[in-house]
Every structure is written in structure tokens, then in C-alpha cells.
């Protein structure tokens, strides 16, 4: 397929009968932008931005950009001093419900006057 035929085939859809007055005003502008912004790809074909002119209130197609480099990166955070590591049993996320000293399965009671469990005070 030659570049010219590719351009004509792609624009044929844009030259179709407009469905509304808005399309009638908008389609010629989109067709012109598509031709103006068609970019030549190394193998000689034309590549177009996808023109979705039939959808209501779409902006004009943007120029196709192939990004090879990444955008600006955030500066690396300065080195923080290492925090002392807690043993796994004392780590706040690992601490389960507090239990009684004897290993009784009753959860620690939250009564302000103290524990009423026969096995002793909670740990």
C-alpha cells in the first residue's frame, strides 16, 4: 500500500455523510488535521492519530509522539537513619489481643476495676 492510498483510505471514513449539523461543521476540520498531522513512519507508510470524530465533543486529535525517554523523576529521598528493629513478638502489627498470664483463652477484660477471671491478671 502506498502512502497516498493509505491517506485516502483513512480519510474516506471522515468524508462520509455527516450525521448531524455538528458533525457537518466538525468533520472537515478533523480531516484537515488528520492530513496535517499524519506522521511518516520509517517504512514509508502514514500513521494517523485515531480520529474519533463521530463521538460527540471530542477534542481534535493530538500529534503522535513516541516517547523514548521518561519524564522528570523525583529526586531521591535522603538517606534516613535506620530505626531500631523490634523483635516480631513486640512489633505493633503482630501484637494480637492481650491474653491472661496463664495462657487462658479468655481475652483480657477491659473492666476498669480489674480482671474478674480466675486465672489471674492479663499480661
From Swiss-Prot:
Residues 57-111 are annotated as: Disordered. It comes from the Eukaryota. Residues 91-101 have a biased composition (Basic residues). This is TYMS opposite strand protein. The gene is TYMSOS.
Amino acid at each position: 500500500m502506498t502512502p497516498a492510498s493509505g491517506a485516502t483510505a483513512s480519510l474516506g471514513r471522515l468524508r462520509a455523510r455527516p450525521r448531524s449539523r455538528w458533525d457537518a461543521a466538525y468533520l472537515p476540520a478533523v480531516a484537515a488535521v488528520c492530513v496535517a498531522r499524519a506522521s511518516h513512519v520509517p517504512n514509508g507508510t502514514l500513521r494517523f492519530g485515531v480520529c474519533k470524530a463521530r463521538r460527540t465533543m471530542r477534542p481534535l486529535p493530538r500529534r503522535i509522539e513516541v516517547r523514548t525517554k521518561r519524564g522528570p523523576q523525583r529526586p531521591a529521598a535522603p538517606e534516613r537513619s535506620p530505626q531500631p528493629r523490634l523483635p516480631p513478638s513486640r512489633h505493633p502489627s503482630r501484637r494480637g489481643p492481650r491474653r491472661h498470664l496463664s495462657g487462658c483463652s479468655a481475652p483480657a477484660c477491659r473492666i476498669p476495676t480489674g480482671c474478674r477471671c480466675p486465672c489471674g491478671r492479663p499480661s
